[in-house]
Structures are given as C-alpha cells and as structure tokens.
UniProtKB/Swiss-Prot annotation:
N6-(pyridoxal phosphate)lysine carried by residues: 215
InterPro entries per UniProt: Aminotrans_II_pyridoxalP_BS, Aminotransferase_I/II_large, HisP_aminotrans, PyrdxlP-dep_Trfase, PyrdxlP-dep_Trfase_major, PyrdxlP-dep_Trfase_small
Organism of provenance: Yersinia pseudotuberculosis serotype O:1b (strain IP 31758)
Keywords, alphabetical: Amino-acid biosynthesis, Aminotransferase, Histidine biosynthesis, Pyridoxal phosphate, Transferase
Pathway stated in the Swiss-Prot or TrEMBL entry: Amino-acid biosynthesis; L-histidine biosynthesis; L-histidine from 5-phospho-alpha-D-ribose 1-diphosphate: step 7/9
Name by which UniProt lists this protein: Histidinol-phosphate aminotransferase
GO molecular function: histidinol-phosphate transaminase activity; pyridoxal phosphate binding
GO BP of this protein: L-histidine biosynthetic process
Listed EC numbers: 2.6.1.9
Reactions catalysed according to its record: L-histidinol phosphate + 2-oxoglutarate = 3-(imidazol-4-yl)-2-oxopropyl phosphate + L-glutamate
HAMAP family on file: HisC_aminotrans_2
Keyword Amino-acid biosynthesis found: yes
Amino acid sequence: MSQSNNVTDLARANIRALTPYMSARRLGGNGDVWLNANEYPLGTEYQLTTQTFNRYPECQPKHVIERYAAYAGLPPEQVLVSRGADEGIELLIRAFCEPGQDAILFCPPTYGMYAVSAETFGVERRTVPAQADWQLDLPAIANNLEQVKVIYVCSPNNPTGNLINPADLQAVLALAQGRAIVAIDEAYIEFCPQASVSNWLKDYPNLVILRTLSKAFALAGLRCGFTLANSDIIQLLLKVIAPYPLSTPVADIAAQALSPQGIEQMRQRVSEVRANRAWLQSALQDCACVEQVFTSESNYLLVRFTASSSVFKVLWDQGIILRDQNKQPGLANCLRITIGTRQECERVIAALAPLAGIDNSNNIDNQSKTHSQTSSIRKGTI
C-alpha cells in the first residue's frame, strides 16, 4: 500500500468527494431576521425537572416514547426517538441498504438530506423528478425500483410546500411491497394534521413515517425526532441506533413538550403561523418583483421572483436571510421564506416593495417554463 503524508488521503473516496448538506447555519449570515431554516421565530421556555447528569440516559426514554405514542395515536412499540428526523433518515439506510449494492430513491425538488445520507454510507442515490405539478411520477418510479431498498417521500414537501396525493402514496406503497421501505417524511405535518398517514401503519408493513419536534414544537435546537413504523422495523432500527441517542436534558424537555399543555401550546403556534402565512402570501402578490407565490401547507412559502439573486442580496444586506432554491430542479428564480412573526413578515414586504419587476422569462429553464403551475409569467397563487 502506498503511503501519503496527507491524512485526508486515508479517508474513503466517496467522503472526500462528498459535498455536505449546506444547512442554514453552515451558510451563515449576519441577519437579525432568520427566515431560512423553517424554525419557529420565538424561543420557548422549559425548566429541567431532573438533574441525574452523572448517569447515562435510557436509549429510548420511556416517558418520551409513551407521550409521543399517545400524541400519534400508536402503541409505544411502534415509536423510536432519535437525534432529529435526520438520524431516522440515516438509520433506515444503515438498516436496509447494502453499500455498493442497494439504492435509495427520492423525487426532487425535495429535502437534501436523503441524498447526503445515502452518499455518506456508499449507497446509490436514484432520483425520479417530480411531475410538473410536483406530484409523484408513478410510472417512472415503477421503472426505477431495481435494487431500491428505501423510497423517501416528503409530504408536505420541502421546499415546495405541497402535499403529495394520498392515492399516489398508496400506489408507491403497493409498488414497493416486499421490495422496499417507503419513508414518508412528515416533518411539517402539524401544519396540516389531517394529511397524516400514521393510521396507514396497520395496513402497510413497509411504511415508515418520520417526525420531528423542530418545527411546530419550536424545538429545533433540541434535536429530537421520531420514527413511526411497525414493531419489526423499530426493532431493526434499535440494532443500529447509538446506545444513548438522547441526552437527559433533551428527553426531559421533549417529554414536557409532549404533555397536554405542551401540545396545546404547539397548536396555538400552528394557528399563529397559519395566520401569518396567509398575510404574507397576500402581501407578496402586490410586490412587483414577485412572479408567483406557491400555496403551502407548511410554515414556509416558496416564491418565484423576477430576479431572485438580486432579491436575495437586497434582503441579505438588510439583515433578512432567506433560502435560495435556484439549484433545485424546476425552481429557477425561487426563494423559500420561512413564516416568521408578523413584524418579520412586514419587514420582508417593506424590503421587497421598492424593488421593480424584471422581465426574466428568457432566463427560466425549460423545465420551469413548462411547469403547469407557472406556465404563464404572472402573479398568482397555487
């Protein structure tokens, strides 16, 4: 074996070539209005009720599991708690995918961690682009299932904000039966709880649901997520999860957030976010620099601008940090705006109002131009 003085040469080739997921915090910025990470804009207050920091925590804290199971309407044996839903994404790959042999499948534009997690473990990333209306391309999925072990579907989808048709989700589950796990990412489901498919678990043994406390529960800094599945899958995931995934303070606060009082507070936050979302969606229509505001079932809006790079910089310079989505398929000139407080939403509109519109139709890629939701260059909502 050849020797090298560069220790990075010792790393796996796929890791050396890996482009890491660029989280909102990695991208940085010096703003005071953070609307780029789909966080709740205000802090929450909790008091620790236990001080047993000298002892290792339980792998699966009973009080957290039982409270989330009650909240989700499931038996405790169908719930696993982890360091955010991102760890749940990774656990599925570790448990079900053979590196260098199996693949995962997802449908861009969607959440970026599916791809990064697969690449980290040496598992093929297979993409089937969403259709023009951002729904699933079922025939294409059916034609790309060879060696696929996990299919990830985000609903509501990040960054587009739309729900995936339930009939299409059932079709994917049927296509994958006996072949692959179907993981439905419900990170934003609290903003549209009627759309949850958790009651399908009894009918589909290959269904997994990913959840989090980062969004509506306003605990992004806690790093606490949940995987819902049949007990056989949960037992497999317990084989590969870290021995102490949740620290004692995290488990303590998570249990408080899942108390009846905590759940009621979460629902009040959801109501507030919905009201601010409706206000911002309406106000954006009057901005000359806005081409399209896409209807969302989540805590963010996807907006197509006439010149998104200019808009992004103008707001950045005013301390308002948004999320650029230009590199996602079909999202040319699109920025994602997290729903902040009413005051923060008003600052966004105040910054956008002076900006003139630009005829940028020639710069929108062909996929965007044929997108049924944006087939005409005009303002509106969908």
